[in-house]
Amino acid sequence: MTALRLLLTLITVLALALVLAIYTLGPAALETAQNRVAGDKGEAPSADAVALHQSLDIADLHADTLLWYRSMLERSDRGQVDVPRMLDGNMAIQMLTVVTKSPSGQNYDSNSADASDNITLLALIQRWPLRTRNSLYERAMYQADRLHVFAAESDSLAVVTSSEELKQVLKSREDDSKLIAGLLGTEGSHSLDGDLDNIKRLYDAGFRMMSLQHFFDNKLGGSLHGESNTGLTDFGREAVRLMDSMGIMIDVSHSSPQVVGDVLNLIDSPLIVSHTGFKGHCDQKRNISDDLMMRIAERGGLIGVGF
């Protein structure tokens, strides 16, 4: 009996140690494995290049930093983005997009919307609030809350929600301020949880850019990496019209060519392709056609090319 009791005690201790290890070491291990920086740093830039860089207002249209379990205010050796490194890089504007769902086996070619979700486990290991367990909308709101907390605790980061606020940040930088404008965006509008009223709620939380799709088809329409290759649904059309009426920037970086064309035909506002490449230069599924890129540019749109 004593031996059995000792065995059960040992099993309990080992189980508790495993749980403790998962919750303490798991978040860093996950980001190290999944948020990798590829390649080496290359040659150091010339003095002229550094001087030019320092003279510019540098903007990055895409970063998933809020997904990970670490403070943006502390320098990290994981990933690429935190406030100390943004200051080093003379960043003026940083778009911070929130990831709320990622299909298992995610790839550029074809993903099922019914595939198991990677973010559910990530959120569990990173101890996200219970409300985020089954709601993509709550996952977006949680990450937005994190950004607002970081900004409140920093003299170098401000959450910007209007063109006037952005102008003020850029003006302050002319006076040697190092203030960084942080903007909120969604990585796919499945974060609406199928409810158009959530557009207003996300807007009130500070979101000023919404991408329509990510790596899978959703209620708004087809993804560039989904299975249907369809255009906007009726729900998608309603969502796009509402976003546009509120002044929300619409990002089509992961949308099917049919969705991109539908959006161009539906509204007159400029679009954003926040992170992409040119299909004529790199012919793969990740990049939309040069013809669509030209239509977006002719409309006054903004295209962010990965490097």
Regions found by a protein language model. Give the residues of each.
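Histidine/acidic residue-rich metal-binding segments in metalloenzymes
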Residues: 194-204, 225-251, 255-272, 285-301
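Active-site environment of non-heme Fe oxygenases that use a 2-His-1-carboxylate facial triad
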Residues: 280
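Generic beta-strand/beta-sheet core signal
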Residues: 213, 253, 274-276, 306
